[in-house]
């Protein structure tokens, strides 16, 4: 078995880790960073960019895709809040969500965009490890429903990965935190990421990680905190200038990026400045936006969101049947937990300072790597007992949801209930599988519907139909219905809960495989161009630095090569870019030789002037 990696596929950033020498290690990406921006962009010429280099939403808002995790596994009626926060177009295609890419004149499923991020992580990890990575453990928010979990697996499959396990993010964080803990502790994991929020309570110690309860909100995250600043800035600018910046995509994206930056700075500073010159223009000329944001103002703007974060904490404590005083440690996960008001709120609720021993950006991926190590046989004596976050059941007479597996049931699990017919001589039953906590069918999420035919004619209430729910270790559900008298059976694996039909997933996998060489070539071409641009800059810098130490012929040759290379870059002449880059690198090496030679000549001349004739006697 090759290396199995652990991946935290985040809303804002993603991280990949692996077990090395018995210890979980974060793998840096090709650019040398330990986190990779969960952003994919397509340039006007159709080139694909992934990661930090793709953060170009200000100049290319409609083709830059970020926070896509907020759409994965969802339907149109579930994303009204999230759509307002993007600069790209999101639309419905049948029951699925599609993301428009004008640069390619193509629509993408959210799973395809997430697959691009996964592929970038895995390719960089393969280079780092010196072997091809094909297997992974991927984390999801604990409060992800069945559709979102299946969609995450689909994204992994499209990226060419065998996803061995889907694991909850707070549970992964607990694995990282409690790996070396011998004594039993009750910990609360508070996970506030870019787009989702989870709280899990676990018993940790001596290799056993048991989830007692989990709660959360998949519509709450750092993006929403940014949005509060954005809306405040738009309102203020409209009042002072009479212009609605919310209708200008480019301005809106600049506001979003500036708001995120301000939020981050306010974790360490009590106030910061937002300066956006030329944010818009009128017939009177350009308009600039300048605004001071204090931490107090930020907390006032976000007070509703901060209060909202307390609800899942209280729910998790209630479900675990624990008082706040029973919690030994609070582990903070996700970049948004750096917000001082969040830390203060947690301290107020639990009565103790949060544990600061783990890196909130990396702890989930490290835990996923531990679970990957368990599955690969590298890590022994670890027992992970996770739970299902939401209740599962079926629709019964009157549009009522009858729960079969209550929320916070330890998984994997299997439970059965016997139902009957509602009318005399009913030949079949339609079984609607539901997920949620409400009493009525219409208020819960429908995961899928299937029909059991061939029921023997009988008065209502006589036939016995056994419905069995089976949840695997990934938290993914399959349901079976069996008529006891005839033995007739029908089943459904709730992969239909994914917004992508199986045929679409297979097509996307095939497309990804077919385009692998093209993608690699495009990426190589982008790298060549980036290196050439950097080389031009470095060359100009060195010519200026060593101007008095190199001869005129070399200086002119380098200047001409820089001009040629810049011309090649403008015309996208890749062969010439490579050839002239090599010539320019060789010329730069000559600068080094010339400079060293000139320095030696200077030193020799200096030494000749200061030589003193003398004899040294041998030491006795």
Curated annotation (Swiss-Prot):
Classification via Pfam families: HSP70
Region named Disordered: 592-620
Keyword terms of this UniProt record: ATP-binding, Chaperone, Chloroplast, Nucleotide-binding, Plastid, Stress response
Compartment(s) where it occurs, according to its Swiss-Prot or TrEMBL record: Plastid, Chloroplast
Biased composition (Acidic residues): 610-620
InterPro entries documented for this protein: ATPase_NBD, Chaperone_DnaK, Heat_shock_70_CS, HSP70_C_sf, HSP70_peptide-bd_sf, Hsp_70_fam
GO cellular component: chloroplast
Keyword Ribosomal protein in record: no
GO function terms (MF aspect): ATP binding; ATP-dependent protein folding chaperone; unfolded protein binding
Major location category of this protein: plastid
Superkingdom to which the source organism belongs: Eukaryota
CDD domains: ASKHA_NBD_HSP70_DnaK-like
Stated family: Belongs to the heat shock protein 70 family.
HAMAP family: DnaK
Functional note: Acts as a chaperone.
Protein name: Chaperone protein dnaK
């Amino acid at each position: 078995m090759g290396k199995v990696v652990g991946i935290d596929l985040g809303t804002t950033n993603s991280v990949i880790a692996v077990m090395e020498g018995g210890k979980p290690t974060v793998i840096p990406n090709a650019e040398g960073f330990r986190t990779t921006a969960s952003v994919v962009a397509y340039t006007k010429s159709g080139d694909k960019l992934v990661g930090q280099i793709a953060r170009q939403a200000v100049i290319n808002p409609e083709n830059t895709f970020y926070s896509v995790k907020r759409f994965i596994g969802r339907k149109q009626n579930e994303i009204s809040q999230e759509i307002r926060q993007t600069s790209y177009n999101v639309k419905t295609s049948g029951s699925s969500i599609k993301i428009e890419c004008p640069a390619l004149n193509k629509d993408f499923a959210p799973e395809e965009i997430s697959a691009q991020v996964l592929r970038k992580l895995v390719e960089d990890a393969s280079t780092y490890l010196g072997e091809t990575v094909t297997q992974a453990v991927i984390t999801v928010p604990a409060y992800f429903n069945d559709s979102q979990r299946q969609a995450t697996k689909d994204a992994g499959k499209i990226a060419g990965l065998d996803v061995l396990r889907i694991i909850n993010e707070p549970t992964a964080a607990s694995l990282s935190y409690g790996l070396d803990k011998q004594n039993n502790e009750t910990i609360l994991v508070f996970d506030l990421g870019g787009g989702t929020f989870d709280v899990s309570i676990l018993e940790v110690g001596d290799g056993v990680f048991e989830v007692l309860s989990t709660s959360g909100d998949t519509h709450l995250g750092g993006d929403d905190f940014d949005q509060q600043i954005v809306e405040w800035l738009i309102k203020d600018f409209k009042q002072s200038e009479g212009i609605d910046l919310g209708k200008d995509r480019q301005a809106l994206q600049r506001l979003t990026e500036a708001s995120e930056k301000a939020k981050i700075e306010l974790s360490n500073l009590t106030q910061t400045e937002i300066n956006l010159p030329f944010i818009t223009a009128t017939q009177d000329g350009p308009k600039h936006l300048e605004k001071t944001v204090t931490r107090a103002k930020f907390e006032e703007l976000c007070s509703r969101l901060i209060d909202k974060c307390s609800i899942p904490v209280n729910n998790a404590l209630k479900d675990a049947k624990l008082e706040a005083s029973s919690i030994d440690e609070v582990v903070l996960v996700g970049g948004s937990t750096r917000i001082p008001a969040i830390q203060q709120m947690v301290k107020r609720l639990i009565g103790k300072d949060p544990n600061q021993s783990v890196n909130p950006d990396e702890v989930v991926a490290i835990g996923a790597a531990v679970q990957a190590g368990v599955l690969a046989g590298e890590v022994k004596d670890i027992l992970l007992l996770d739970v299902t976050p939401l209740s599962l059941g079926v629709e019964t007479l009157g549009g009522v949801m009858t729960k079969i597996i209550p929320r916070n049931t330890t998984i994997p699990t299997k439970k059965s209930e016997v139902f009957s017919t509602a009318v005399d001589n009913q030949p079949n039953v339609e079984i609607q599988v539901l997920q949620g906590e409400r009493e009525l069918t219409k208020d819960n999420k429908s995961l899928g519907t299937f029909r059991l035919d061939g029921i023997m004619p009988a008065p209502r209430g006589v036939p016995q139909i056994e419905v069995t729910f089976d949840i695997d270790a990934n938290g993914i559900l399959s349901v079976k219905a069996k008529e006891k008298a005839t033995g007739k059976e029908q089943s459904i694996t709730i992969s239909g809960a994914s917004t992508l039909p199986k045929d679409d997933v297979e097509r996307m996998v095939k497309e990804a495989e077919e385009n692998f060489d093209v993608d690699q070539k495009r990426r190589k071409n982008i790298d060549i161009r980036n290196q050439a641009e950097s080389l031009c800059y470095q060359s100009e810098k060195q010519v200026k630095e060593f101007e008095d130490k190199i001869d005129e012929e070399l200086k002119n040759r380098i200047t001409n090569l820089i001009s040629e290379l810049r011309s090649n870059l403008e015309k996208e002449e890749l062969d010439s870019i490579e050839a002239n880059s090599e010539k320019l690198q060789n010329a730069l090496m000559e600068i080094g030789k010339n400079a060293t030679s000139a320095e030696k000549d200077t030193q020799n001349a200096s030494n000749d002037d200061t030589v003193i004739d003398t004899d040294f006697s041998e030491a006795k």
